[in-house]
Amino acid sequence: MATGTGKHKLLSTGPTEPWSIREKLCLASSVMRSGDQNWVSVSRAIKPFAEPGRPPDWFSQKHCASQYSELLETTETPKRKRGEKGEVVETVEDVIVRKLTAERVEELKKVIKETQERYRRLKRDAELIQAGHMDSRLDELCNDIATKKKLEEEEAEVKRKATDAAYQARQAVKTPPRRLPTVMVRSPIDSASPGGDYPLGDLTPTTMEEATSGVNESEMAVASGHLNSTGVLLEVGGVLPMIHGGEIQQTPNTVAASPAASGAPTLSRLLEAGPTQFTTPLASFTTVASEPPVKLVPPPVESVSQATIVMMPALPAPSSAPAVSTTESVAPVSQPDNCVPMEAVGDPHTVTVSMDSSEISMIINSIKEECFRSGVAEAPVGSKAPSIDGKEELDLAEKMDIAVSYTGEELDFETVGDIIAIIEDKVDDHPEVLDVAAVEAALSFCEENDDPQSLPGPWEHPIQQERDKPVPLPAPEMTVKQERLDFEETENKGIHELVDIREPSAEIKVEPAEPEPVISGAEIVAGVVPATSMEPPELRSQDLDEELGSTAAGEIVEADVAIGKGDETPLTNVKTEASPESMLSPSHGSNPIEDPLEAETQHKFEMSDSLKEESGTIFGSQIKDAPGEDEEEDGVSEAASLEEPKEEDQGEGYLSEMDNEPPVSESDDGFSIHNATLQSHTLADSIPSSPASSQFSVCSEDQEAIQAQKIWKKAIMLVWRAAANHRYANVFLQPVTDDIAPGYHSIVQRPMDLSTIKKNIENGLIRSTAEFQRDIMLMFQNAVMYNSSDHDVYHMAVEMQRDVLEQIQQFLATQLIMQTSESGISAKSLRGRDSTRKQDASEKDSVPMGSPAFLLSLFMGHEWVWLDSEQDHPNDSELSNDCRSLFSSWDSSLDLDVGNWRETEDPEAEELEESSPEREPSELLVGDGGSEESQEAARKASHQNLLHFLSEVAYLMEPLCISSNESSEGCCPPSGTRQEGREIKASEGERELCRETEELSAKGDPLVAEKPLGENGKPEVASAPSVICTVQGLLTESEEGEAQQESKGEDQGEVYVSEMEDQPPSGECDDAFNIKETPLVDTLFSHATSSKLTDLSQDDPVQDHLLFKKTLLPVWKMIASHRFSSPFLKPVSERQAPGYKDVVKRPMDLTSLKRNLSKGRIRTMAQFLRDLMLMFQNAVMYNDSDHHVYHMAVEMRQEVLEQIQVLNIWLDKRKGSSSLEGEPANPVDDGKPVF
């Protein structure tokens, strides 16, 4: 027929905006996956990936096909090559995807670079603002930002309006469908032509001219049943009582019956024959009163379709009067809030109501559903006429005369609803109504029109006069009462309304309860029906998408239709109340129904970009358009997973793709960003959120950091594997479930396990040793916190924690040694960043928290827990570690009492350690002067190779060498028992070497040999530390040894006098490091201090101070020789820095520091470090953050602290392995770390 022409012109009426590379890549990937013939699947899969602001039909099937054809035209087909068997030939789809992937990668690189530049610019501006340099421009900056934001919003609004206008224009010019569906109906008892079925329709020329101007449109004549939309539902006829006289005059368009109309005519025949060829069938209200048909005429010429409600009073059977002139009666309009003129129009009493096609489709669908139920429920009464082919048909309306015609989009909703209703409800319709092509088109139409924003046309409420007729006739009056309410529609399951008889009324009212402006696609839901809807799943999905795309607002429409005859006929009102099936608030309407799947249906049909992209495959999971039977099973979990990404999906643009958050929830990885303070300190630079995204970085410093990160990841995985191979690791390998540990997640708020730690390392969430150690400690802390102290898992956690921390300590020490030995006193940060990078405000007062030096130095503060709590001391395996590690102090919940860890120590090992020192102290102190020369010769021979090596490298590392006095005061005290248990392992040659050293010490200070022994036979005064044994082994001449003993006697009096009186001698140099195993720093330390260290036995304060000065002068020289030391050498003058003394109350410089050291004002390492930090802090406080002196101070402070920490750690280790039990070396400092 004529209405089916031009159906393929839609290919040229799609959106004209260019596609982004991302959208093209999504399209190409979906085509490669689903094929270039299955556009339904392709369109459905890529709908979530539309850019913000795209029109609803952007990813329509025809638009996708058109765009892909353009891609094919611009892509060269790969030439076929004869390859070997099994060789994969690249197809054109592969070429397109590969090409677009490369373009997308380049685009992302550019985006990342721009983001990094913008970040640096914003960071620089923020620092200037914080420093107070832009206080005068703050208002101007705020105004600029507000203006820019306003302009952006205006541009976005203009673009959005242009897009909407273009979309509405496309909707208006779309051609009609291939055919117009007709629902066949039957005449009731009082039909004028018994045995014939006729459709009702007021098809006067005036109506056709006005209602169908420009475009073929559908019209719908409803004799009885529901006028169902998402919000407008009118139930007319069927239950109205007889109106006073029992008859209503028919309009003049009544004509005689046509012989050809004995069958079931279609709407096309009506259009061809004209309005005078068919008689208007008669309907009755119950049995007597005639039914007023309702006609909907939506002209798609406007931005929104308009439905025309035509009230056509039917004439009884005996009445065959000629045409009677009609008069037009205008009813009063009562509008409390929003005044919308409403007029009752002339015959056939047409009232135009503006609505979009989504509501029209709902009207049509619900009419069929209700009519079908009513037809099935009540036995058909009246004559049944056979159809054209002679078969009796079951109409959708047994008691009504219905003719339906509607022009939708590509294929109208009525056709879809008709076909689906026939398929699902097994309605035996006429063969004309259903064919294979229509079914295929309907399924395609469902796929294409399921977009939530497919029909965003706003509801409008002007009810205008359709046409004027000069001939008057008493016309029925219509009362429409509208109330608006706000609610959220969750799932439309065929909502209908119940007819309610109300008192007569003669006014037309529109009463919006909540006056609002134009509301886009407002839902108006009427009636309450049982949950078991007859609407098929496809239609429900389609309706739901339309509702989700519209604003969550509903209306209760009360239509009081009053039909009267003259003035003496009372008006009978049909008042229809609409009640939402499920609302946000029950108080907004009557009989609200709570829907438990509310959250599910809101998110069922949307998928955010970030969630899809982090799943590994873009199209790994499809979104089902129609809620299926398994909706209740997996819907809740899917809704939960989609809820958060949906909120973030609006306006993110490319950022939603760049987020790439690993699929590890907060409950899985055990910590959130606001708790991970380490990240804010150590990862302040623009570090990508994952290693995968970091490969697109183009900055040179980022490339260096990436390489360092790869190396670190390989190294830390060795530590992880050591922990995973622990004998108790099976308890900590997988996350703990509530089945295994009831109530675990109510006690442990941040669960952690080894598999999560590994996943976080691979994903880039853990990027430093500090973060790794934090999560390891968190894992054990959770086990200790949940389990009771007598539980097996508690003890397993404690023991495994100790062993794993030993591994981490070894890793940190090795990392520190490698960095120190590779770079020496390098300016490069231990994080692999360039030394000239800007420091954060958090780095002003401390060394980078991720550096091994910082971790090791912080851990030393906890060593006192062992000493003060009188618990068991570390065993031999702990002493073999290079240093004391950090106890995670970033989170208070991780701060364990280290003394508790030692409760599981083996007591037999302790007895073995305690028994060995008592066997040999006496023989170690035997002074045999005659054997001194032979022992010295043996010592020289054994250390000849070591001296050769030291002579080559001592010069490079000399600035690191300071005396052990520094560590005794600045770090932690010696542990007297740290050498216990090691003497058994010492070699015989080393014992002789140490014995010779003791004799030399006894010679230099006779007091050592004369001290009486204590209760256990141990001397009350200890000999030199064990490190002296190695130092003395480096001497080449006995005179040098004596000279150094003398100088050392002066140097170290202050340090060891207070603790030597009650300590047993360390008779051996057995500190678990023989010559082959001695680390580089140990040997350097030994060589550098060989000219200073010797036995200390004199308690002379003057000599102690001289020793302290001699010890710190090399440190001061090291600092003064730094490349950035020039601004700090001399006091700052007022000429150089105006107002300096007003800002800095306690000036400090290197010259003043040296003077205070010489005059005795600085007597401890703590005071030295205090003044040193004061000097740097003054520079940071006075200068701006962008000043070069500021950066010099920050960087120099960092490097000096790192070097001092390295020395303190190793000196403490060496001293701790040789010292014995006693009081802290410096009562003032109490051994606590001072930095």
Swiss-Prot record:
Gene Ontology terms describing biological process: cell surface receptor signaling pathway; cellular response to thyroid hormone stimulus; chromatin organization; positive regulation of DNA-templated transcription; positive regulation of double-strand break repair via homologous recombination; positive regulation of transcription by RNA polymerase II; regulation of apoptotic process; regulation of cell cycle
Annotated Acidic residues bias: 905-915
Cross-link (Glycyl lysine isopeptide (Lys-Gly) (interchain with G-Cter in SUMO1)): 481
Region (Disordered): 186-205, 551-597, 621-672, 827-848, 903-940, 966-999
Record keywords: Acetylation, Bromodomain, Chromatin regulator, Coiled coil, Growth regulation, Isopeptide bond, Nucleus, Phosphoprotein, Repeat, Transcription, Transcription regulation, Ubl conjugation
Cross-link Glycyl lysine isopeptide (Lys-Gly) (interchain with G-Cter in SUMO2) per UniProt, renumbered positions: 469, 481, 509, 575, 612
Sites bearing Phosphoserine, chain numbering: 383, 387, 579, 621, 637, 641
Localisation per UniProt entry: Nucleus
Tissue-level expression: Expressed in adipose tissue, brain, heart, kidney, liver, lung, pancreas, placenta and skeletal muscle.
Domain Bromo: from-to ranges: 706-811, 1099-1207
GO CC aspect terms: mitochondrion; NuA4 histone acetyltransferase complex; nucleoplasm; nucleosome; nucleus; Swr1 complex
InterPro entries, alphabetized: Brd8_Bromo_dom, Bromodomain, Bromodomain-like_sf
Biased composition (Basic and acidic residues): 831-846, 979-999
Modified residues (N6-acetyllysine): 85, 481
Gene Ontology terms for molecular function: nuclear thyroid hormone receptor binding; transcription coactivator activity
Coiled coil: 97-171
One Pfam family this sequence matches: Bromodomain
Alphabetical list of PANTHER family matching this protein: BROMODOMAIN-CONTAINING PROTEIN 8
Protein task: May act as a coactivator during transcriptional activation by hormone-activated nuclear receptors (NR). Isoform 2 stimulates transcriptional activation by AR/DHTR, ESR1/NR3A1, RXRA/NR2B1 and THRB/ERBA2. At least isoform 1 and isoform 2 are components of the NuA4 histone acetyltransferase (HAT) complex which is involved in transcriptional activation of select genes principally by acetylation of nucleosomal histones H4 and H2A.
Assembly notes: Component of the NuA4 histone acetyltransferase complex which contains the catalytic subunit KAT5/TIP60 and the subunits EP400, TRRAP/PAF400, BRD8/SMAP, EPC1, DMAP1/DNMAP1, RUVBL1/TIP49, RUVBL2, ING3, actin, ACTL6A/BAF53A, MORF4L1/MRG15, MORF4L2/MRGX, MRGBP, YEATS4/GAS41, VPS72/YL1 and MEAF6. The NuA4 complex interacts with MYC and the adenovirus E1A protein. Component of a NuA4-related complex which contains EP400, TRRAP/PAF400, SRCAP, BRD8/SMAP, EPC1, DMAP1/DNMAP1, RUVBL1/TIP49, RUVBL2, actin, ACTL6A/BAF53A, VPS72 and YEATS4/GAS41. BRD8 isoform 2 interacts with RXRA/NR2B1 and THRB/ERBA2.
Name of the protein described by the UniProt record: Bromodomain-containing protein 8
